[in-house]
Amino acid sequence: MKILVAMSGGVDSTVTAYKLKNLGHEVIGCYMKLHGKPNYHEENIKKVEKVANFLQIPYHILDLQEDFKNKVYMPFVDTYKEGKTPNPCALCNRFIKLGKLLEFAKSLGCEKLATGHYARLENNLIKTAVDESKDQSYFLASADKEALKYLIFPLGEMKKEDVKKFASTIEVLKSFATQKESSEICFVEDTYVQVLDQFMDTKIPGEVLDSSGKVVGKHEGYMHYTIGKRRGFEVRGAHEPHFVLKINPKQNQIIVGTKEELKISEFNLKNINLFIDAKELDCEVKIRYRSKSTPCKVEIYEDKSAKITLKDPVYGLASGQMAVFYDHDKVIASGFIE
């Protein structure tokens, strides 16, 4: 089978390419240039070239910087401007890795696209990985349903420690087993605010309000805050911790309150991404990557919006983040929180 492998220069994509080549597939590597972070690509491309030469496979360098800027980078900036919390990895998977890269794979005549994600596929549904601590099904849940039939995740049945051990047994790949793992957001060096600073003044002080609308303090600029944050703002006369409940970007205000006020029992989605045919769901939902799943009921409307009612309340639901719905270990839907 002719397979395009997304290669980053990391241990996961390297072992993915190695395993598929060893199984006798016709493997082609591809490195994606997504952003212009200084010295980032040169080092990675050297690693990809080293692996490609060792495996005796061809590889391509695909410049997707313009697509990435339009579909991931600027929406990241704009979402923070709107006082919401973006999910760039989910957008990148849908539009870039499982979008533009898949188009490129098809243009080369490849039957499948393989990535080093920790996830599995079964009956055209994404499943959680064997290694729960590294499971990436949450970020893949934004994928177009039609893309799933072209995908392979060879590491889905492996634990990360075994992937590293495997690489360490092969002389040429030993260095990949010990290299530092990449950060979650590839274009963020230290903090997201440093990215925003390139486009706007993020340090404009504003008012802190309590939930009744009373001014109780000051903050250093609304873009420094996300829902649930409890530091970096002043609350006069507070005797218990206060958390960000809401952000009003136009007024440069943040509304704060107690942990109890952070509780949410229902929320809405727009443009639900369904992997099964349904008008309602009785399932579990994750409201952020590292959160535990919570039982819920989902009502889906004609315009693809949805209302979610939670069995137990959650804390710190952030508008702009992705909610992912599971039937046990299978992803059945996803959508961005309004």
Curated annotation (Swiss-Prot):
Any GO MF annotation of the entry: tRNA-uridine 2-sulfurtransferase activity
Class in the EC hierarchy, top level: transferase
Keyword RNA-binding in annotation: yes
A biological-process GO annotation: tRNA wobble position uridine thiolation
Binding residue positions for ATP: A6, M7, S8, G9, G10, V11, D12, S13, M32, G116
Residues annotated as catalytic: C92 (nucleophile), C186 (cysteine persulfide intermediate)
E.C. number(s) listed in UniProt: 2.8.1.13
Keywords: ATP-binding, Cytoplasm, Disulfide bond, Nucleotide-binding, RNA-binding, Transferase, tRNA processing, tRNA-binding
Disulphide bridges: C92-C186
Interaction with tRNA (site feature) positions: H117, Q321
Domain of life: Bacteria
Reactions it catalyzes: S-sulfanyl-L-cysteinyl-[protein] + uridine(34) in tRNA + AH2 + ATP = 2-thiouridine(34) in tRNA + L-cysteinyl-[protein] + A + AMP + diphosphate + H(+)
Pfam families: tRNA_Me_trans, tRNA_Me_trans_C, tRNA_Me_trans_M
Subcellular location(s) of the protein: Cytoplasm
CDD domains, A to Z: MnmA_TRMU-like
GO annotations of cellular component type: cytoplasm
NCBIfam families, per the entry: PRK00143.1, trmU
Family: Belongs to the MnmA/TRMU family.
Reported function: Catalyzes the 2-thiolation of uridine at the wobble position (U34) of tRNA, leading to the formation of s(2)U34.
Name this protein carries in UniProt: tRNA-specific 2-thiouridylase MnmA
Organism: Campylobacter jejuni subsp. jejuni serotype O:23/36 (strain 81-176)
Gene: mnmA
